[in-house]
Design a protein with these regions (language model features):
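N-terminal basic, amphipathic alpha-helical segments
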Residues: 1-130, 334, 338-345, 366, ...
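Amphipathic, non-transmembrane alpha-helical secondary structure
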Residues: 8, 12, 182, 186, ...
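Short beta-strand "wing" residues that participate in macromolecule-binding interfaces
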Residues: 57-58, 166, 426
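Conserved core of the PLP fold type I
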Residues: 133-273, 278, 284-299, 372, ...
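Short, conserved active-site loop motifs that form the nucleotide-linked donor/cofactor pocket
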Residues: 275, 305, 391, 424
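PLP-dependent aminotransferase class I/II
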Residues: 305-385, 392-394
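AMP-binding (ANL) adenylation modules
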Residues: 432-436
Length: 470
């Protein structure tokens, strides 16, 4: 991000937060130049960017003023899915989207990919090079089945921040959170079982369940506080549910952080009905609050919570470093790993361990939390400007994803196909439902560095939505 883009993002965030109100005069070009230690031309470019976004308006000989803005869109209401076990219907649509990711000319707003070009990752790339040069025998040999111990020790220390007390022996390294969740599900479930999920739910989890022949029951979910405990309890009383998949911290796709009281209530239900909880904490480190939120796993006393996480969202997906803390299912998960995915790559594990050990990871996370928070604020500004007034939009408490609910008549599955022909890809809401619900919704990735390309893409998405409403 250039200096003027950084300044424009900062000012846009202040406007979004109400620090500069409608009609209020903004600081002069010279005063901003002095305050931020940048050139006058940098400030002028930043103001021009905000003017293009219609966040500010110039007045001759008077300076810049905050422009009149559309009203803040409401947060989507509690979801109301079909509350009975169903077979997952979303398959081809998800595969088509994943295949399209290989086209480098597409603006990838559908992928949940972090910013991997940030300077805070440079120590990791240097360490990767050093590991390969100086540990050739280890790098080219077989890994330990549980993964490199030095990495498991560092992960155990990281998990203390979320309230979980584990040792290196409790942790199994996997090839990402997706792999960890897949192994956890296979260790517990068999074809014909029923698993409860939040609604909407990350499509990757449902693809695993479909591949295993497992049915799903979607539970109503509040976009600000998470799954409905009452609805979950009712489902547990009615159906032989084997377990529940939850993303309680910086949820994908809704962005909420489940309050601690609700996390404990869900765990209490799991204990009472003797089911397992598959907890996905891959976004937990990216929470805007500090200290980071606790996991449900941190209150688990009988090993029924299988925690799955990775560095795919906090560092980079290409590392392929994930982990599981599967509690009472540890040995079974080890057997499943050996049978299905076997060993991991030692080099990326060793580099990641050093990255954490030397303090680079925490510095990187602090930077990314700030960057993603700014991005979410600016993307929200763009969406408010270019989309219809009738939308609802989430207010994520971390991570880098936005969920947008459009008017009922908008079919985002059809709109997404049109956008794909325009080289813009979004994730239509229907892939986040077992039964194809949420066709009038979409998820947007806000992690990528801010640029005119993404602003123009959001403008074109808004125009396509307007056309769909005609």
């Amino acid at each position: 991000m250039t200096r003027y883009q950084h300044l424009a993002t900062l000012l846009a965030e202040r406007i979004e937060q109400g620090l500069y109100r409608h009609g209020e005069k903004l600081p002069s070009v010279r005063s901003l130049s002095r305050e931020h230690g940048v050139s006058i031309s940098t400030v002028q470019q930043a103001y021009q960017t905000l003017e293009t976004m219609k966040l500010i308006t110039p007045q001759p000989r008077s300076g810049y003023f905050v422009a009149q803005r559309k009203a803040q869109p409401p947060v989507p209401p509690m979801t109301r899915p079909v509350q009975r076990p169903v077979e997952i219907t979303q398959w081809d649509q998800v595969l088509d989207m994943l295949v399209a990711h290989s086209d480098s000319s597409i603006v990838p707003l559908s992928k949940s990919t972090p910013d991997v070009e940030t300077p805070s990752l440079k120590p990791l790339w240097r360490e990767l090079s050093r590991v390969v040069q100086h540990n050739l025998q280890t790098v080219l040999g077989y890994d330990l089945l549980a993964g490199q111990r030095v990495l498991r020790e560092q992960i155990a220390r990281l998990m203390l921040d979320s309230g979980s007390v584990v040792t290196a022996d409790d942790i199994i390294i996997t090839s990402g959170c997706h792999n960890s969740m897949s192994l956890a599900l296979m260790a517990v479930c068999k074809p014909g079982d029923i698993v409860a999920v939040e609604s909407p739910c990350y499509y990757g989890s449902m693809q695993m369940l479909r591949g295993m022949g497992v049915k799903v029951i979607e539970i109503p979910t509040d976009p600000e506080t998470g799954i409905s405990v009452e609805a979950l309890e009712l489902a547990l009383e009615q159906w032989p549910i084997k377990g529940i998949i939850l993303v309680p911290n910086c949820n994908n796709p809704l962005g909420f952080i489940m309050p601690d009281a609700r996390k404990r209530a869900v765990l209490s239900l799991a204990q009472r009905h003797d089911i397992v909880i598959f907890e996905d904490d891959v976004y937990g480190e990216l929470a805007t609050e500090y200290p980071r939120p606790r996991t449900i796993h941190s209150w688990d006393i009988d090993g029924r919570v299988l925690l799955c996480s990775s560095f795919s969202k906090s560092i980079a997906p290409g590392l392929r470093v994930g982990w599981g803390a599967p509690g009472r299912y540890h040995d079974k998960l080890m057997h499943m790993k050996y049978a299905i995915s076997s060993f991991n790559v030692p080099s990326t594990q060793m580099a990641a361990a050093t990255f954490v050990l030397e303090g680079h990871y925490h510095r990187h996370i602090r930077r990314m939390r700030q960057n993603y928070q700014r991005n979410l604020a600016l993307y929200t500004c763009w969406i408010r400007e270019y989309f219809p007034c009738e939308i609802c939009i989430t207010r994520p408490k971390g991570g880098f994803l936005l969920w947008i609910e459009l008017p009922e008549q908008v079919d985002m599955v059809c709109v997404a196909r049109q956008l794909c022909r325009m080289k813009i890809q979004v994730a239509a809401g229907s892939i986040f439902s077992a039964s194809g619900k949420y066709r009038n919704c979409l998820r947007i990735n806000c992690a990528l560095p801010l640029s005119e390309t993404y602003r123009e893409a959001l403008k074109q998405i808004g125009e396509a939505v307007y056309r769909a409403m005609e």
